[in-house]
Swiss-Prot record:
One Gene Ontology cellular component annotation held by this UniProt entry: plasma membrane light-harvesting complex
Pfam families documented for this protein: DUF2382, PRC
GO terms, biological process: photosynthesis, light reaction
Region Disordered, residue ranges: 253-274
UniProt-recorded name of the protein: Uncharacterized protein DR_1314
Alphabetical list of SUPFAM superfamilies matching this protein: PRC-barrel domain
Superkingdom of source: Bacteria
One example GO MF annotation: electron transporter, transferring electrons within the cyclic electron transport pathway of photosynthesis activity
InterPro entries per record: Bac_photo_RC_H_C (IPR014747), DUF2382 (IPR019060), PRC-brl_dom (IPR027275), PRC_barrel-like_sf (IPR011033), Stress_Response_Assoc (IPR052967)
């Protein structure tokens, strides 16, 4: 497997798909690295992993304890994970000296990989080397994807508030006064005679002016309501659904093997997921 098909473990965290800060996840970055006889050789700076599964394939080790300014890639099967660091029990100073120097700005080429294999393999067969080199250490925790949801603000809309005129018919009762003529007639009972008067002569006419009130209509604007506009934040819960993955161990047991529960497995090959 070439580096082209592997990515750095730190890049998984940058993609926010894997939570490397979770205590249930194993993150070797920053762990102390020890070589043969428990000699401290430096620090694990990073790891190369399969992007699809997150499985570690190489530890990127800064071997400053043996050689200044040199980083090498050590297959995961050569590491033994402990609370105090990662132990490469069979890794010697001479091997590290002959291994290819890894630089972040260059690919881990097939030539470099072959060189490191020859150095680490020694007298082992190629099959034995590959079986060991990429075998998961006894304690290597698995990565699990978890949803990381961020929030950003955007303009959801706008509200425009103005005024318009609406009309309605309004009826008001107004009391109005007017004058009317009152004619009073009184009968004369003493029958006085009018001397020299001839009927029809001296015709007289009386004129009376009448007054009346009329309604004068006008309109006046009054303040009936005041409107103030502001904003307030309301919180609503939105459910987000996405597919996430996690690593599971494929345990292959061959022959007469006992599990931690003490159950004997006698089938030739038994495979189960944990």
């Amino acid at each position: 497997m070439t580096q082209a098909s592997l990515i750095r473990l730190s890049e998984l965290n940058n993609d926010a798909q894997y939570n490397l800060n979770d205590t249930s996840m194993y993150n070797p970055v920053g762990a102390a690295a020890y070589g043969v006889n428990g000699d401290k050789i430096g620090t694990v700076r990073d790891a190369l992993v399969e992007p699809e599964t997150g499985r570690i394939r190489y530890f990127l080790v800064d071997v400053g304890g043996w050689f200044s300014s040199k980083e090498v890639l050590v297959p995961v099967g050569y590491g033994r994970v402990d609370d105090s660091g990662v132990y490469f029990d069979s890794l010697t100073k001479d091997q590290v000296k002959d291994m290819s120097e890894y630089r972040a700005d260059q690919a881990y080429s097939s030539e470099m990989m072959d060189t490191d294999e020859r150095v680490l393999r020694g007298n082992q067969s190629q099959e034995e080397y590959h079986q060991r080199a990429y075998q998961t250490p006894d304690r290597l925790q698995l990565l699990e994807e978890r949803l990381v949801v961020n929030k950003d603000r955007f303009k959801a809309g706008s509200v425009q508030i103005g005024k318009r005129i609406e009309t309605r018919q309004e009826t008001v009762s107004v009391p109005l006064q007017r004058e009317e003529v009152v004619i009073e007639r009184h009968a004369v009972t003493d029958g006085r005679a009018v001397e020299g008067a001839v009927l029809g002569e001296g015709h007289q006419t009386m004129s009376v002016d009448l007054e009346a009130e009329r309604a004068n209509i006008s309109k006046q604007a009054y303040v009936t309501e005041e409107v103030s506009v502001g904003k307030r934040a309301v919180t609503e819960t939105q459910q987000v659904t996405e597919t996430v993955g996690r690593e599971v161990l494929d345990v292959n047991q061959t022959g007469d093997v006992r599990t931690t529960e003490g159950t004997a497995l006698t089938d030739d090959t038994t495979k189960r997921n944990i």
